[in-house]
């Protein structure tokens, strides 16, 4: 009914919150089609990060009334400004591990992972080599197969099959990590697997401020 007015700007405050899951998916597509057809500005308020990622051309992420980051969906996903944004955007959420830098390695009491030269140079430039930091890595950037380096043994606590893929909830050296894996292989709770960290895709955050180190 509001769209009939042909306004310059439309404000939609969680319009799909009372719909069931299937209808929400359908209506997301319909609203996106309307946006393209009307070629007007729509300010869409939502607590559902999936709605934000799939519908927006630009996302404003807020916490406690304060803007955390503004950007295109892909930018916000790939270059989160801080740990709040990194943990909010993406499902399952980004994995976080607290540690320090030792030479060219990110280390905890139980893990040791080699950092690519480009990312190590940024950490050096920002003076982060001798400070506690947090490494973030998304579930799709941890792979259930062995490579030349950055391989760790993990134990599966829960294996969720979603159809085309598995969500593996694992324990790795005392850390709880989620791994996104293809469904070509079967995975089971209690199984031990080797996982590979794609460190070219990792993110680093200041442990105190939680701001991304870039």
PLM features: residue spans?
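Non-catalytic connector elements of ABC transporters
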Residues: 92-96, 104-214
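Short, surface-exposed, charged/polar-biased interaction segments
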Residues: 37-40, 44, 48, 55, ...
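ABC transporter nucleotide-binding domain
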Residues: 73-103
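Residue-level detector of alpha-helical recognition elements and their boundaries
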Residues: 30-31, 46, 67, 80, ...
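ABC ATPase nucleotide-binding domains
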Residues: 1-84
């Amino acid at each position: 009914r509001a769209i009939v007015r042909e306004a310059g700007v439309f404000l939609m405050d969680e319009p799909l919150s009372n719909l069931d899951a299937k209808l929400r998916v359908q209506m997301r597509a319909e609203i996106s089609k309307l946006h393209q057809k009307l070629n007007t500005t729509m300010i869409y308020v939502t607590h559902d990060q999936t709605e934000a990622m799939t519908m927006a051309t630009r996302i404003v992420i807020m916490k406690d009334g304060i803007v955390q980051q503004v950007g295109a969906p892909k930018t916000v996903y790939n270059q989160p400004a801080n740990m709040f944004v990194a943990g909010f955007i993406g499902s399952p959420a980004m994995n976080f591990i607290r540690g320090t830098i030792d030479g060219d390695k990110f280390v905890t009491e139980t893990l040791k992972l080699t950092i690519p030269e480009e990312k190590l140079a940024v950490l050096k430039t920002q003076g982060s080599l001798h400070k506690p930091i947090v490494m973030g890595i998304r579930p799709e950037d941890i792979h259930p197969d062995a490579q030349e380096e950055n391989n760790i043994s993990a134990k599966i606590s829960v294996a969720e099959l979603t159809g085309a893929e598995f969500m593996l909830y694992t324990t790795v050296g005392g850390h709880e990590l989620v791994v996104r894996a293809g469904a070509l292989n079967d995975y089971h709770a209690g199984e031990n697997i080797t996982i590979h960290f794609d460190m070219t895709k990792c993110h680093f955050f200041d442990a105190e401020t939680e701001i991304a180190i870039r």
